[in-house]
Design a protein with these regions (language model features):
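CRL adaptor-proximal regions
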Residues: 1-68, 437-438
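F-box-proximal linker/hinge
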Residues: 47, 55, 59, 106-157
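The Skp1-binding helix-loop-helix core of N-terminal F-box domains in SCF E3 ubiquitin ligase adaptors
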Residues: 69-81, 98-99
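Short helix-loop-helix/strand-helix junction enriched in hydrophobic and basic residues
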Residues: 81-98
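Conserved hydrophobic beta-strand positions in leucine-rich repeat
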Residues: 104-106, 133-141, 162-167, 190-193, ...
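Short, solvent-exposed loop/turn at the beta-strand->alpha-helix junction
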Residues: 110-117, 144-149, 170-175, 196-204, ...
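A structural signal for leucine-rich repeat
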Residues: 118-123, 151-157, 177-184, 200-217, ...
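C-terminal interaction modules of eukaryotic adaptor/scaffold proteins
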Residues: 373-438
Length: 438
């Protein structure tokens, strides 16, 4: 009984991070941890601090000066810190210094991540009861067993959290996300991509009541990735925009229910957006581009790939008002022609990356406008552009010397044209489907 009571107060086993058949638990290594496999699940025990013993004579602890010079980015990851804590009592105390735990990173589909987070945060809260004041980043992407319980643990224990990534954790819901953004006021980076139950980002009702009518500005999120949150609708986007007014990076890839109306809400509240993706949002049209154009010179990155309702009209809105655009992905927007490329090239002369693949109405004429205006172009994708020939490529290569990537797969271009590009753009990597060109 006494042994069991000691275990509940101590070090998380590395088995919380890795199942028994992982490399760290093969060939007898890691045998000091208590773990067992039951019906394919890892059952991790929590151990007491190891007894004090002499460290290995070849192991030297860093001096105070060396510690001050250490690069925080080189700290061991979560699983290695847990293993270090098993070496001896001194290493145990060093490994659990809260200053080493600015980041928790857990990976794996089978890991019991809810339990792992509970044990880790409980240990890190011992010096500052109930809160982990040093923890700023939690990354549990791909941990499919994460549930609302795990997010509640983070919300309750990590008030200084700045970055949370739960990509692919499809069991979490709006309520748990609301708790995190309400109890972690410094949260700036949130990745809930692939979390299909998440349809909104908002403060909890209790938190909203305590704040002023402008409580939406209390959410400090700047980076929000909701890729593949395919249940998100315009009303949800309206709520997100009203609460997250400081957004600078927003990714809505494959949020297929979003329409131009949702983008109108977004532009009312979020006027600082620099990067925006609405790729594969098939209901977004030229009217949506008119709304996005209200970002004007602040917009640097835009992805509208496979938005089939966007034509030259929408491109003209962007080109006219967003003159500092650096990246545009318009792949699969089959309504774009040489006229749209002309508007873009003449107004967005600082363009560095352009993808107009699968735009069959873009020809060598459009490439000529690019070549004569966008000298800083570094990446150009023309994949499956049926109207492109070697002549257009040669014009681009003769003017855009800094070109680093060119995709002409499934284009009817000659070997001579590809060799011309290679001669003029020395650093260019050419992706092609011409077997005669090496």
């Amino acid at each position: 009984d006494s042994d069991l009571s000691m275990r509940t107060l101590s070090t998380p086993s590395p088995a919380l991070i890795f199942p028994p058949n992982s490399p760290g638990f093969q060939n007898g290594r890691g045998s000091s941890t208590s773990s067992s496999s039951v019906t394919g699940e890892t059952v991790a025990m929590v151990h007491s601090p190891p007894p004090t013993r002499l460290t290995h004579p070849l192991i030297r602890l860093a001096s105070k000066h060396q510690k001050e010079q250490a690069n925080i980015d080189r700290l061991p990851p979560t699983n290695q810190l847990c293993r270090c804590a098993r070496v001896c009592r001194r290493w145990y105390n060093l490994a659990w210094d809260p200053r080493l735990w600015r980041t928790i990173r857990l990976t794996g589909e089978t890991i019991n991540v809810d339990r792992a987070l509970k044990v880790l945060t409980r240990r890190l809260c011992q010096d500052t009861p109930n809160v982990c004041l040093m923890l700023e980043t939690v990354i549990v992407s791909g941990c499919r067993r994460l549930t609302d319980r795990g997010l509640y643990t983070i919300a309750q224990c990590c008030p200084e959290l700045r970055r949370l990534e739960v990509s692919g954790c499809y069991n979490i819901s709006n309520e748990a996300v609301f708790d995190v953004v309400s109890l972690c006021p410094n949260l700036e980076h949130l990745d809930v991509s692939g979390c299909s139950k998440v349809t909104c980002i908002s403060l909890t009702r209790e938190a909203s009541i305590k704040l002023s009518p402008l409580h939406g500005k209390q959410i400090s999120i700047r980076y929000l990735d909701m890729t593949d949150c395919f249940v998100l609708e315009d009303e949800g986007l309206h709520t997100i925009a009203a609460h997250c007014t400081q957004l600078t990076h927003l990714y809505l890839r494959r949020c297929v229910r979003i329409t131009d109306e949702g983008l109108r809400y977004l532009m009312i509240y979020c006027t600082s957006i620099k990067e925006l993706s609405v790729s594969d949002c098939r209901f977004v049209s030229d009217f949506g581009m008119r709304e996005i154009a209200k970002l004007e010179s602040r917009l640097r990155y835009l992805s509208i790939a496979h938005c089939g309702r966007i034509t030259d009209v929408g491109i003209r809105y962007i080109a006219k008002y967003c003159s500092k655009l650096r990246y545009l992905n318009a792949r699969g927007c089959e309504g774009i022609t040489d006229h749209g490329v002309e508007y873009l090239a003449k107004n967005c002369t600082k363009l560095k990356s352009l993808d107009i693949g699968k735009c069959p109405l873009v020809s060598d004429t459009g490439l000529e406008f690019l070549a004569l205006n966008c000298f800083n172009l570094k990446r150009l994708s023309l994949k499956s552009c049926e109207s492109i020939t070697g002549q257009g490529l040669q014009i681009v290569a003769a003017n855009c010397f800094d070109l680093q990537m060119l995709n002409v797969q499934d284009c009817d271009v000659s070997v001579d044209a590809l060799r011309f590009v290679k001669r003029h753009c020395k650093r260019c990597i050419i992706e092609h489907t011409n077997p005669a060109f090496f």
